[in-house]
């Protein structure tokens, strides 16, 4: 791996089948140990129940308010500054409950790849 700076381009945001908008900040085979994405849930939006196999995920809440559900735990409110740690294989979903979109960084180790994603709502 060589040193580099990945530039942010708002136009790179896309809608992901999970139910939120994603902007991949860093996700490359050249850096297999970690990926970072900016996720955005619109007002009232909610992700599908899902889990990531062999990947630990962390949500770093940047803006808005939400309710996160993890495995069999009771739903918990989250807001700016909170960090949610999601073990590999743990069922999860998050919902925007505030008056503005819920924005968070999703940090995955190792990096997120489509094959690790399992939709549990199907």
Tell what function each PLM region has.
Residues 46, 52-80, 90:
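A short beta-strand-loop-beta hairpin characteristic of the jelly-roll/cupin
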Residues 22-24, 36-40, 58, 75, ...:
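Conserved hydrophobic/aromatic beta-strand scaffold that supports enzyme active sites
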């Amino acid at each position: 791996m060589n040193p580099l700076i990945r530039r942010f381009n708002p136009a790179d945001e896309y809608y992901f089948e999970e139910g939120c908008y994603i902007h991949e900040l860093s996700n490359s085979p050249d850096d297999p140990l970690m990926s970072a994405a900016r996720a955005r849930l619109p007002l009232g939006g909610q992700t599908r129940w899902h889990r990531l196999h062999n990947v630990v995920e962390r949500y770093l809440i940047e803006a808005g308010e939400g309710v996160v559900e993890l495995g069999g735990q009771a739903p918990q409110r989250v807001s700016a500054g909170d960090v949610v740690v999601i073990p590999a294989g743990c069922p999860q979903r998050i919902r925007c409950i505030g008056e503005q979109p819920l924005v968070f960084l999703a940090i995955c180790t190792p990096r997120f790849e489509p094959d690790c994603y399992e939709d549990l709502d199907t």
